[in-house]
Amino acid sequence: MPTISQLVRKPRKAKQVKSKVPALESCPQKRGVCTRVYTTTPKKPNSALRKVARVRLTNGYEVSSYIGGEGHNLQEHSVVLIRGGRVRDLPGVRYHTVRGSLDTAGVKDRKKARSKYGSKRPKSA
């Protein structure tokens, strides 16, 4: 336990908080180009083929980004927008692609939570 005079001489250091999304560099989203679009399998209790894109960002970083929703139109050289947000059962995937922006199409026939998947409002009969 330091004395008050020791604390006056050398104050306590504030703990540095490490960013969970370093590639975004404090931006809400970043643009990038897909270098590889592939499927991968999740961690132990789950089983699926998760859609993932490897993206080279405008700041030079290369990251893995999850493609949410049913079906997508991404391929190599597609320009995408990524946001933060990890996928718990895919190690190393800390970003999500934003659906419905740039080259990424929105999810077709989506009725609920449309804003998260870039779907337009369906025409009411």
From Swiss-Prot:
Gene3D superfamilies: Nucleic acid-binding proteins. GO terms for molecular function: rRNA binding; structural constituent of ribosome; tRNA binding. The keyword Cell wall biogenesis/degradation does not apply. Residues 9-18, 109-125 have a biased composition (Basic residues). InterPro entries: NA-bd_OB-fold, Ribosomal_uS12, Ribosomal_uS12_bac. One of its GO terms (cellular component) is small ribosomal subunit. Residues 1-23, 104-125 are annotated as: Disordered. One of its GO terms (biological process) is translation. Keywords: Methylation, Ribonucleoprotein, Ribosomal protein, RNA-binding, rRNA-binding, tRNA-binding. The modification 3-methylthioaspartic acid is found at residue 89. It holds the Pfam family Ribosom_S12_S23. With S4 and S5 plays an important role in translational accuracy. Part of the 30S ribosomal subunit. Contacts proteins S8 and S17. May interact with IF1 in the 30S initiation complex. Belongs to the universal ribosomal protein uS12 family. This is Small ribosomal subunit protein uS12. It comes from Nitrosomonas eutropha (strain DSM 101675 / C91 / Nm57). The gene is rpsL.
